[in-house]
Amino acid sequence: MKKYNFAIIGVTLLLSLSACNDWLDIDPSDQVSSEKLFESGDGFRNALNGIYIAMSSSELYGRELSWGLASVLSQTYADNDITKSKAYGSAMEYEYGETEIKAVLESVWSKGYNVIANCNKLISEAEAKDSTAFREGALERNLIIGEAKALRAMMHFDILRLFAPSVESGDESKRIPYFTVYPSKYEPNLSTKEILNKVEEDLLEARQLVAKHDTIVNTSTMASPDYRMGGTNKATGGDFFGQRGIRMNYVAINALL
């Protein structure tokens, strides 16, 4: 597993859980119940796409885990580049008790674990579904499960980097939980080494699941940057299987390992 020298944030956060009324059996016009969503194979495609959309939010890779908080903590920016943001100013000085940076950290934590919960829901539903429910059979089912497991691993890994100590520090305190089932309201906190072991386990399983698609069936979609990113080459099975460069693919999983 690659090593990252990242600031350790000793912050205890609570996940907030929301409940809905059992008697309300009417779906909002812009939402679909999980039962309806997973009735067909296409619903699994939509659910996976929804996970990618959630990960692109400003709380995660749309800002904080890319050019936002993560870059501030790595001291990428000069002081005068971030003085207008009190949250980032506090982060740069590792002053995590300030209200503004607390709000940012809480949003990363809650949004990250929400993504993980959605990955777990998708995995459990797909594993319980016969491969005949998917247009491309076992190939598609395995690809969806593989991507979801790899995304779950990556999300845990980035939460670990922010909220737990480095292995090299020798600190074996247990800081974050690792969720693999849905629903699950509680999992015990684990040490950094324990989390990394689970991340590696998920990634190894994911690599095996996506391998046939990315290295045998649709190798052309991985052949060049144009094919991976631009979709200039038609993928076997349709558009869902194209543009692998913007999805969790075999090469990306190996890079994480």
Report residues per predicted region.
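Bacterial N-terminal signal peptides that target proteins for export
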Residues: 1-7
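Membrane-proximal, proline-rich intrinsically disordered regions
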Residues: 4, 20-71
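Bacterial Sec-type N-terminal signal peptides, specifically the leucine/valine-rich hydrophobic h-region
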Residues: 14-17
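Aromatic-residue-lined binding/catalytic grooves and analogous aromatic/hydrophobic interfacial grooves
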Residues: 21, 204, 251, 256-257
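Conserved, well-structured interaction surfaces
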Residues: 45, 86-163, 184-194, 204, ...
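Short, flexible, mixed-charge acidic loops at enzyme active sites
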Residues: 165-179, 222-225
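Surface-exposed intrinsically disordered loops and tails
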Residues: 217-243
